Structure formats: structure tokens, C-alpha cells
Amino acid sequence: RSFQSDLAIPGDMAAAMRWMHEELSERASKNQNRYDSLKEASDARRETLATRAEAGNGSPMSHAWMAKCVSDIMDDEAVIFNELGAPLPFMDLKGPNRYFNPPHSGGLGWGFPAALGACLADKNRLAIACVGDGSYTFANPLACHMISNSLDLPILVIVLNNGVWNAVRRAALALYPDGQASKMN
């Protein structure tokens, strides 16, 4: 009701769906070359990403390699709450609603508590919080770990420690590139 319609087709829903299926099937067969080229490009991209992730298998490991490894251990129901740690392109998720990012309104420290919320919603589902060291600190980790432990929640917390609060640093440098923050860390 709240979306504008370009074309309304009144009629019997079952008959309309059969007709649409026939029409769309004909169009799909006409576009097979395009689908094939898109699949080829997608496969090549995935291969490039896998190579890039593998290159980060060292000490310290890259975010790409860590994301690939986390993706490998996730079962069909696991969910990840990413806060500046696990880049999605390097993950092979098993279905929808498996990967969450912080809201655009901000929220350093969002990942760990959000993962706890997912655990509370379904105690049989592994929740993974993948956060940077600054995000971890802003999450009030003592309280989060106490809640997780006292309620026996199935959570895995991965903290990527780069020794700097990069999100804060990037924000400060974006506003004040020559300010005091540019001389720190």
C-alpha cells in the first residue's frame, strides 16, 4: 500500500502467476549469455578474493583471512555481528540474516552487546562478535562477559587488536587532518 505501482494488473492471482512465469521464463532463456558472463565474472572475483584472503595467513593475520576462517567454522545457523573486523566479501555465509553491521548512526561498542541479544533470542544459535580493540572497550566488556557467563550464552568474541582506535582516529582526521590527533599513534 505504501509503494507506488507503475502498472496494476487485476485478475486471478494463480492465473496471473502462471502467465508471469511463462513470460519470464522466455525472457530468461534469451539472456543466457548475459547470465553466463555474470557467473564467470562472479567466479573470477571470488577466486581473487580467496587468493587475497590466503595471502593474509600469517602473523599478524589479515582481516580478510580472519573473516574467511570465521566463515569456515560457521554452521548453518550461526550469526556474526561485525564491528570493524570481518569484511563481508571474504565470507561465504550459509543463508540470509547471518551478517550484521553497526547502524549508520554510529555506535562503537555495538557488536558485542548485539551478539548477546542474538544469543538471548535463540540460545541454540552461535553468535559471533567480531570487533576491533576500541569497539571491544566501548562495549563495556566486563558487563558483557558477566552476562554471557551467568546466562551460559553461546557466544564467540573475536577481538582484532591493531593497537589503535582506528575508527576514532579516522573520524578525527577527517575533520581535523592537521590537528593534534594527526600527531598521535
Regions found by a protein language model. Name each.
Residues 5, 54-58, 132:
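Conserved short-loop catalytic and cofactor-binding motifs
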Residues 21-29, 75:
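Non-catalytic alpha-helical coupling and interface elements of nucleotide-dependent molecular machines
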Residues 40-122:
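Active-site diphosphate/adenylate-binding microenvironment
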Residues 4, 9-16, 20, 34, ...:
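General structural feature for long, well-ordered alpha-helical segments within catalytic domains
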Residues 28, 78, 125-126:
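Secondary-structure boundary/capping signal
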Residues 27-42:
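Flexible, glycine/charged-enriched surface loops at secondary-structure junctions
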